[in-house]
């Protein structure tokens, strides 16, 4: 009798315990330790978490990045400078009259910004000799801020005026050099022993250009992409031969637009990014930060978008270059709200807080895969918002 009663009581006890486990735990606070269950929320709508937001331009040259930009779109202008390598030291006796034909060869890429009606881009351009030294560190202002005459010979040595088809694989653009171009090449052959005085050529878009087109060039450390090439057919000692010079120095120079005052812009090519200052003084000294979200609205009507989709991801990183890489974050685009939202900035704010900073600065920029391969612009109107979910740790 007592044995059966004991078994029955045990079964009832198990049933009671099992029924008590059927309720799912609450998702709010379930991941937090017992001493951190008093959660608090700070919102930038109530507390001045965002101290300031502004656009800044980074002086980052577009040198051997894999893409060259050439053309015009609105007030944006893109030029190309090329310096050629592998000029042999055996052609000093070749004159301009010995050069039968000289052709600059460029490989178009699929990307274009501007008018692409009819499946082609209209990017007429001229080729000019460069008359002074330029390095991979050069930017637009260091070359053209005071006009073209200080950097370029204003007499063109070749020109292109035909539409360039927009295809995944387009025929190369081949530009014949004129007699002045032949004379320039003969001068290069004579100067080969002092190649520092060979400054290369510039490709300058005509005012009638209606788009900016991308062309291929070498990426640093990668030799697979086609290079701009100068093909020279010449006669020497009664024989005709061909010389091919590769564009070892290839750089784009983009004149930034002057309409950025008071605007928040992200734009590759001209390297616009946004700097945001976050105030931390509203957080208790021993706060534990659990979640931080930044909401970034966009103005799609003010976008400049080429023939590729605009970037759906933004990169957020601390302005302090000494900060660890793991605290970087990303924001993804939500079409329903026309905004980007971060996954979490908790690690970044926790880093600032642990280093006793009352203000932290973060940079919003485009991801690396589009930073040098496009000229698209993303416009951010005022109205960024931030929320911080935190708890207070027990006082010691």
Tell me the role of every PLM-derived stretch.
Residues 2-6, 10-11, 18-396:
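Secreted, disulfide-rich extracellular signaling modules
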